[in-house]
Amino acid sequence: MPVSLRFTNTLTRRTEPFQPLKDGQVSIYCCGVTVYDLCHLGHARSYINWDVLRRYLIWSGYAVTFVQNFTDIDDKILKRAAEEGSSMEAVSERNIDAFHADMDALGILRPDRMPRATRCLEGIRTLIAELEAKGAAYSADGDVYFAVMKHAGYGKLSGRDLADQQTNADGRVADAEEARKQHPFDFALWKGAKAGEPSFPSPWGNGRPGWHIECSAMVREELGDTIDIHLGGADLVFPHHENEIAQSEAATGQELARVWLHNGMVNVGGEKMSKSLGNFTTIRALLESGLSAMTLRLFVLQAHYRKPLDFTAEALEAATTGWKGLNAALSLGDLHAEALGWTPAEPMGNDAVVASESSAIDTLLSARQRFSAAMDDDLNSSGALAVLFELARPLRALANRLDRGDAPNHNDDDGQELLQRWLLLRELAAVLGLRLEHPSAPEEESDLDSQSIEAAIDARRLAKQSKDFAEADRIRAELSAQGIELIDKPGGITEWRRG
């Protein structure tokens, strides 16, 4: 495990050595999506960055427990359900399914646990009751608010000073509720029931939880009072993460998280990409446009996770070119192993670099060390990518020759060095979640590729959820005509195979 791993901690505003609470173990909580719509590129950036963090920690020898939530009850979900004439549950389930499909397409490892707010209601009610008993919360006309003036540390994450602030900190509370608050920054822990909205029983009357208390309760339930790392986008520093800290620490008297990491925003034309501004592009639309998942990963990882990421055609083109070269190098062992006389093995262990010449050993050891040094330096993914491109250069040249039909021309020592170089490239690429993509081509009897089939299955699932069974049957019949058989499994899962 690296002793030199350092992170820039939003809480302390310093880049610090990382030391987990328990040696060799890391507990991580990542704020998930509010499931009212499809995910956009901004979400992709967050979850690609944190996927790489998780992969690097695992590769470095840590046992990682990674928890990421779904916010499945929220004003935005209720608004979408009302617009569709649907239910909160239907909107949530549809978008949770879509989230999984998008993340799987991007090669993002699924979290170890994915709690939902609606399945953590008992923990939420318990936490609110504890805050009320300690004088940190108060009731007002069926609502319950957190009293920010009762928590001395409020503002320590965002740097906000309560004395200078006159606007509310809830982020999702209407102006009409301000009169009931003791301070403008007080935020809702429990919202009293409203006509026509789902509600749940509580000691304060029927209602539903506020946004921030959900995460505090899920962190506590899944990982305990104090965790190693808390993740999210920079837009969550205030109010969401500030409020999480306040309510959790007021209840437990313990530090919520040792390290807070926040990724920068994706910008379009100088503005943050967001659904509210209407300047967003969904992950699904990008992939359906022909952009490969690995190109999208490379685009994200070319920038440091804390810096803004400009979404431009030129940046995507550069990522496409870069991935084409890396993919060609990664393909060597799969496409040309016989011509090279290679017997590809599993990726090398973290310390196992073997070559027949000392210069080759030095080259590969240096590459591994520089990769680790970059990642240890606050997840410098662009520096790590530079090592991958350096490793790939002679492999890409060899791949180009083989594609032209030129016979390989190297002695045994050269061949061994190239094999070890390829194995190391494959290993380090996997740490960044980069995997070989074969060129698109007609597959067996069908011209449909896997991504198109999965998209059709998603469309069929949505049709069934909307009770448009005629459309669902049409999609099944269309796939069947192209040799694709669908197998529906319990839990709404659909598998497929080529007939």
Curated annotation (Swiss-Prot):
Required cofactor names: Zn(2+)
GO biological processes: cysteinyl-tRNA aminoacylation
Q: Where does ATP bind?
A: 275
Q: Where in the cell is it found?
A: Cytoplasm
Q: How is the cofactor bound?
A: Binds 1 zinc ion per subunit.
Q: What are the GO MF terms of this UniProt record?
A: ATP binding; cysteine-tRNA ligase activity; zinc ion binding
Segments traversing the membrane:
none
Write out the residues that bind Zn(2+): 31, 215, 240, 244
Q: Which reaction does it catalyse?
A: tRNA(Cys) + L-cysteine + ATP = L-cysteinyl-tRNA(Cys) + AMP + diphosphate
Q: Where is this motif: 'HIGH' region?
A: 33-43
Among the Pfam families in the record, one is: tRNA-synt_1e
Its Enzyme Commission number(s) read 6.1.1.16
Q: Which InterPro entries match?
A: Cys-tRNA-ligase, Cys-tRNA-synt_Ia_DALR, Cys-tRNA/MSH_ligase, Rossmann-like_a/b/a_fold, tRNA-synt_1_cat_dom, tRNAsynth_Ia_anticodon-bd
- Tagged with keyword Lipid metabolism: no
A single Gene Ontology CC annotation of this entry is: cytosol
Keywords from the named record: Aminoacyl-tRNA synthetase, ATP-binding, Cytoplasm, Ligase, Metal-binding, Nucleotide-binding, Protein biosynthesis, Zinc
Q: Which ranges belong to the motif 'KMSKS' region?
A: 272-276
Give the multimer and partner information.
Monomer.
What the record says about family reads: Belongs to the class-I aminoacyl-tRNA synthetase family.
* PANTHER family the record matches: CYSTEINE--TRNA LIGASE, CYTOPLASMIC, CYSTEINYL-TRNA SYNTHETASE
Protein name, as recorded: Cysteine--tRNA ligase
